[in-house]
Amino acid sequence: MSMPATSTKTTKLATSLIDEYALLGWRAMLTEVNLSPKPGLVDRINCGAHKDMALEDFHRSALAIQGWLPRFIEFGACSAEMAPEAVLHGLRPIGMACEGDMFRATAGVNTHKGSIFSLGLLCAAIGRLLQLNQPVTPTTVCSTAASFCRGLTDRELRTNNSQLTAGQRLYQQLGLTGARGEAEAGYPLVLNHALPHYLTLLDQGLDPELALLDTLLLLMAINGDTNVASRGGEGGLRWLQREAQTLLQKGGIRTPADLDYLRQFDRECIERNLSPGGSADLLILTWFLAQI
């Protein structure tokens, strides 16, 4: 399909550098979905609480999205002189086109819609920082992404009308701001919790997969995951958070033997039809930011 125009302004960024970050985004998506076992989520073992998607759908989806990540970076660079609040409007057509390719790759299954939003924001932030010759670090990337989203929660979640979206309904009922709120705040769950936790475990010599699984548990324990709340209401969300917190308090995932706890947690999530997709999206960002 034809790609939407990004900007008439040229960028000084090397194609190889753009492709390097896009490749990291693709690897982040694959790393997350291949990670196993994950409670309630699609992985190499089963489809979790999802009856409409499989591992191969995520592989096809990630490949389709990878082709669009350079466009997010390029737009971030080309719009570097724009006010940050104006950038999101220009990113939307790219995101919608990327989403269309995702749905075509998966025959209509929503595998990575949340990641298109979050990775698209981070890639645009990276492009802006590179164009302005500013350091690209997890902190600068997240703060730049936050500047793109200033006022987003007010605009999109606090609107009162008779046709509430799922996000608006969960915000009004439970105060959950979901992906929008986390982005507008600069991804504090990732920057202040998941990323340092993951890096500390790696520094301690823990196997990278076990470290990621333990980090996923941490995110599940602290994230007000709208994916979980939309399936199980407030009760389902609180149950999942408590279970994750209990496993962490028992020592978390430190050895292969601890995977039995995750397998049991997975069975219980499937029985309750709960899938922590929002936490999975944040895990993708955690791995991505750990590489830069």
UniProtKB/Swiss-Prot annotation:
Its EC number is 2.4.2.52. GO terms for molecular function: ATP binding; triphosphoribosyl-dephospho-CoA synthase activity. It comes from the Bacteria. It catalyses: 3'-dephospho-CoA + ATP = 2'-(5''-triphospho-alpha-D-ribosyl)-3'-dephospho-CoA + adenine. Keywords: ATP-binding, Nucleotide-binding, Transferase. GO terms for biological process: prosthetic group biosynthetic process. The keyword Magnesium does not apply. InterPro entries: CitG (IPR002736), TriPribosyl-deP-CoA_syn_CitG (IPR017551). Disulfide bonds: none annotated. The keyword Transferase applies. It holds the Pfam family CitG. PANTHER family: 2-(5''-TRIPHOSPHORIBOSYL)-3'-DEPHOSPHOCOENZYME-A SYNTHASE, TRIPHOSPHORIBOSYL-DEPHOSPHO-COA SYNTHASE. Catalyzes the formation of 2-(5''-triphosphoribosyl)-3'-dephosphocoenzyme-A, the precursor of the prosthetic group of the holo-acyl carrier protein (gamma chain) of citrate lyase, from ATP and dephospho-CoA. Belongs to the CitG/MdcB family. This is 2-(5''-triphosphoribosyl)-3'-dephosphocoenzyme-A synthase. The lineage of its organism: Bacteria, Pseudomonadati, Pseudomonadota, Gammaproteobacteria, Enterobacterales.
